[in-house]
Amino acid sequence: MAARPIRPIVPSTRQTSTAAGRESSLTLDRGLALLQAVADADSEAPTISELATAIGASRAAVYRLLVPLQERGLVRRDGSKVRLGLGLLRLAAKVTPQLRLAALPALRELAESVGATAHLTVADGDEAQAIAVIEPSWTTYHVAYRVGTRHSLGRGAAGKAIGLRDETPGWIATTGELQPGASGIAAPVRGVPGLRASVGVITFHELDGDVVGPKVRAAATAVADALR
């Protein structure tokens, strides 16, 4: 009796697509890890070898992963060195409007509740920059705190709140650090990866921290929830 030929086992379409999807996901993850390694490197332009060590891959793998990142302008190569590309600026330009839009409802409610100018402030290097500001509608006067206002992270409630540790109280108050006679209370926006920001209020009248502090902290939490 003749032996039957052994049929090769051919993966099903579902198995093949699942494997391909898993491989694509791993490649994407490694590509993002590589981009992060370039951004986090101690030097301005890390080498291929340094990046390979940073992400636990071979030099050949790093070269392959760099190709799509270069094509999209996210990185640029200078010989064996790699720098961040200008394409990241185009992506970054889309972030601020989205942050502002997500924060506006919470800021509006905070400003109306406290009767003070409410703001969302983000860290930009060693400075704090206001990217969204809402003024109360019913007060006679209020602090003119404008979008784009910058100051040191070490001055004012907005900047100092960004650096608050998780184990510290949820808000911080300052007086006269940015404008003479102006008082501010701010709380950090926590739980949003990659975002260093705070929500706060600033006014010329005295603020009761026991009353306003929890409101500011709740607004910061609402902003974080809107961004997740």
Identify the role of each PLM range.
Residues A37, A54, A102, A106-S113, ...:
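Generic non-transmembrane alpha-helical segments
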